[in-house]
Structure formats: structure tokens, C-alpha cells
């Protein structure tokens, strides 16, 4: 037997993005984000080395302002089970000339791989909506004016064969989902969906 010494140099796992961008909704908007893909929630001395993903993102424009803080542990309880949580805020005026919409809340999720390319995900989302109707809005929009609490749970199954998530060159993504809003709150709806891209 022989001993083999291997030196490993860890690449940078954190990033900071600040910039200006354009979109069809906003003529121009500012954005900023901090991401650490080797975060460690349980190591308060350095907060790195745990393989978790932590991100803070914000965007400010004339029509939208939003911000979010998210954290994902891909090996929750030392199992092949991803646990994620997110806190978010959004203020939008581009939906209609007759009303503005503000929403904020949090979400928690569990994602379990089935095979190499597919997984199931269970998510719970609690979200506060505020609809502000404008003075010249039709009566329909004034009937929706006010605050609404939405408590939503959703189960989805996804097959993802893409070679990359940001700029895929081949493969596709297929998703089937079912959700229910009504575990408390003011909204009581069902939703079912099938999404796909190739």
C-alpha cells in the first residue's frame, strides 16, 4: 500500500451581482444579488462549508419592486432530501392601470429525487395580498379592493432532462402539479397544471 496525497483547491462559491437591465415591462430597472452556494447555517463562526445555498435578491424599477431571501439545504437531516425556505416581497403596478398589487409572505418546501432526472416537491406558501384600486377604476376592481391572506399547499412531479438550467442547449422539462388554497386564510381554490418545455 502507498499513501497518496491529493491537494484540492476550493473554487469561489460566493457571488455579488449589481447592475442595470431592461425589460418589456420596465424600461430600465436596477438589481442586486448575493449568493453563497457553500453556505452553512449551523456554523456561526464562518457560515461557509455546509454545501447549502443562500441568496438575497432585490430589484427596483418604475413598475415593480421586489426582494427575496432564500435558503436551501440539499441534504436535510443527512438524507437525499432538499429543504428550502424563502421570504419574499413584491409591489407591482404593471398588471393594470386600474389597481396596484402588493404581496409578501414566506414559503417552505421539501424536494425528493426519484431518479437521476425526476423529483417530487411539496411546498407550502403563506402570502398576504393587497389590492389598491385607483379612483377611476370600474366597479369590478373596487369589489376586489382590500387585503387577502392565501394559504396554499402544492404537490408537483418534475422530469428535467436539460443539460443546464440557465442556458440549456438540449433536453426539456415536464411538470405535473396540483394545489389547494384554503388551509385558513381568505382564498379557497384548487389548481391543477401541466407545464412543459423542450
Please annotate each region the language model reported.
Residues 1-167, 172-173:
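Gram-negative/organellar outer-membrane beta-barrel architecture
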Residues 104-110, 172-182, 187-198:
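Transmembrane beta-barrel strand/turn architecture of Gram-negative outer membrane proteins
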